[in-house]
Amino acid sequence: MLDREGFRPNVGIILLNARNEVFWGKRLREHSWQFPQGGIKYGETPMQAMYRELHEETGLHPEHVKIIGRTRDWLRYEVPDKFIKREVRGHYRGQKQIWFLLRMVGRDCDICLRATDHPEFDAWRWNEYWVPLDAVIEFKRDVYQLALTELSRFLRRPAQRAEKPRGPRMSRYPRVIGAQAQTLTIVDTSVVCSEIEVEASTLDEMPPHVIVGK
C-alpha cells in the first residue's frame, strides 16, 4: 500500500526502560541495528499497527508497555534503488512513519525475539537515549535523529545529548568492528531469566541478550 508519492505507511517504535535506555535490535544475520518498525496494513490505525509490530518483533503485548508520546506527523525516508526490488522501482520511494515512544512496564524477560516464525532480530540490548547512529543503515539515520529529537520532550527527565567521545566508555553503542572472539555471560530472555555462556564475534560489545538455538 503506497501513497500517491510512492511512500509506504509505516510505524516506528522507540521503546524505553525505567532508566530511559532505548531498545535496539540487531537485524537477523546482519551487522546493522535498528528500532522495531513495520508497515501499516490496510484497515489498521497507526496504533493498531504499532502494537502488532511490537509483538511480532519483541514478543511484548500492550500490557507490557505504556504509550508516552507519538510524532505529530509523518517522517519520511527514501530507500536507495539498490535496496528496492526491480519490479517496484519507479513506484516505490521509501517509508513514511508515525513514531511512538513507549515505556516498558514489564520485565526484560518478557521480551522474546521468536514470537513469530519470521523474527526480525537475533539479538537486542538497551542503550542510552542519545548515542551515535553508526550501526543504523545510512538512509534511516536522519529519520532516527528526527524521531529521537521530537519525542525526547516526553521523557520524565530530558535526556542530554551525548558529548564528544571521551575514551573507551563511549564504545557502549552498537558499533561493528573486525571480528574478535570472546566469551561473555548473557541472558537468553526468550526462554527464562537465566545466565548462559556463548561465543561472541564481529561486535565490539556483544549485546547482553541473544537468541540461542531452538
Swiss-Prot record:
<protein>
    <recommendedName>
        <fullName>RNA pyrophosphohydrolase</fullName>
        <ecNumber>3.6.1.-</ecNumber>
    </recommendedName>
</protein>
<comment type="function">
    <text>Accelerates the degradation of transcripts by removing pyrophosphate from the 5'-end of triphosphorylated RNA, leading to a more labile monophosphorylated state that can stimulate subsequent ribonuclease cleavage.</text>
</comment>
<dbReference type="Pfam" id="PF00293">
    <property type="entry name" value="NUDIX"/>
</dbReference>
<keyword id="KW-0378">Hydrolase</keyword>
<dbReference type="InterPro" id="IPR022927">
    <property type="entry name" value="RppH"/>
</dbReference>
<dbReference type="InterPro" id="IPR020084">
    <property type="entry name" value="NUDIX_hydrolase_CS"/>
</dbReference>
<dbReference type="InterPro" id="IPR020476">
    <property type="entry name" value="Nudix_hydrolase"/>
</dbReference>
<dbReference type="GO" id="GO:0016462">
    <property type="term" value="F:pyrophosphatase activity"/>
</dbReference>
<feature type="short sequence motif" description="Nudix box">
    <location>
        <begin position="38"/>
        <end position="59"/>
    </location>
</feature>
<feature type="domain" description="Nudix hydrolase">
    <location>
        <begin position="6"/>
        <end position="149"/>
    </location>
</feature>
<comment type="similarity">
    <text>Belongs to the Nudix hydrolase family. RppH subfamily.</text>
</comment>
<dbReference type="InterPro" id="IPR000086">
    <property type="entry name" value="NUDIX_hydrolase_dom"/>
</dbReference>
<dbReference type="InterPro" id="IPR015797">
    <property type="entry name" value="NUDIX_hydrolase-like_dom_sf"/>
</dbReference>
